[in-house]
A protein has these predicted regions:
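Helix-to-loop junction immediately C-terminal to a conserved catalytic motif
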Residues: 20
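Conserved catalytic motifs of ABC-family nucleotide-binding domains
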Residues: 122
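Catalytic Walker B motif of ABC-type/P-loop ATPase nucleotide-binding domains
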Residues: 126-129
């Protein structure tokens, strides 16, 4: 089913590597696209694309050369490359940088190039491990617009691990996990309903940026679960076992 699913786990990278068939579970089992990732790892890898946090771009190669290299690695036929590359370039706004070395791109554009290289072979399922970490807010917004376009236009299914609640809100389903166990799952709206009475909005005092207030709230680990800037204010979630006066 074409949609974006968010996973909010501890040990995010470990889970994503297991889903990609790169790491076997210590115990239990895991199925992706109906396949057992331990027994059918190669079959899983043939149908998915995986973008880790540190995607392996070749910084001395140009944007176009990186795309060509990954197309070669994935066996993308020459007959479909021109159209596929043109579409990826248009979506990521990389068309004007085709001759630029990847190492000369901004952080946000590098992430877009990594995504384009991941998508050269039109996978059934895309796995993204915290794709917006270290990316500026504008590039982060652009990245999510690209993902939504892929789901809409190409019927692509996406699983994304993220620690950002505002990103999870843009997904069709959210799974909150810890130590391999699902703590909660459902639509963002359903999970938000469960948090009713635990979610608050704080306004920074004069002279304080929302990001600074967010940092202070996140430092209060005994009382605050998460805090996200939103429109100059900060929305935060209080731990359910803490008195409201705390």
């Amino acid at each position: 089913r074409a949609e974006i699913v968010a996973v909010i786990p501890f040990y995010m990278t470990t889970l994503m590597r297991m889903m990609a068939g790169l790491l076997a579970p210590d115990e239990g089992s895991l199925r992706v696209l109906g396949l057992d990732v331990t027994r059918d790892a190669q079959a899983v890898q043939d149908r998915i694309s995986y973008m880790p946090q540190r995607f392996g771009l070749y910084e001395d190669l140009s944007v176009q050369e990186n795309l060509d290299l990954y197309a070669d690695l994935h066996g993308v036929p020459q007959a479909v490359r021109r159209e596929r590359f043109a579409r990826l370039m248009a979506m990521t706004d990389l068309a004007r940088f085709t001759a630029r070395p990847a190492g000369k791109l901004s952080g946000g554009m590098k992430q877009k190039l990594g995504l384009a290289c991941t998508l050269v072979r039109s996978p059934e399922l895309l796995l993204l491990d915290e794709p917006s970490v270290g990316v500026d807010p504008l590039s982060r917004r652009d990245l999510w617009e690209i993902l939504l376009q892929l789901v809409r236009d190409e019927q692509l299914s996406v699983v994304v691990s993220t620690a950002y609640m505002d990103e999870a809100e843009r997904c069709a389903h959210v799974h909150v996990m810890n130590a391999g166990q699902v703590l909660a799952n459902g639509t963002p709206q359903a999970l938000a309903q469960r948090a009713q009475g635990l979610t608050f909005v704080a306004t920074p005092p004069d002279g304080m940026a929302a990001r600074m207030l967010q940092a202070r709230l996140l430092d209060a680990v005994s009382t605050v679960v998460d805090a996200v800037p939103r429109g100059g204010r900060v929305r935060f979630i209080r731990r359910p076992d803490v008195d409201e006066e705390a």
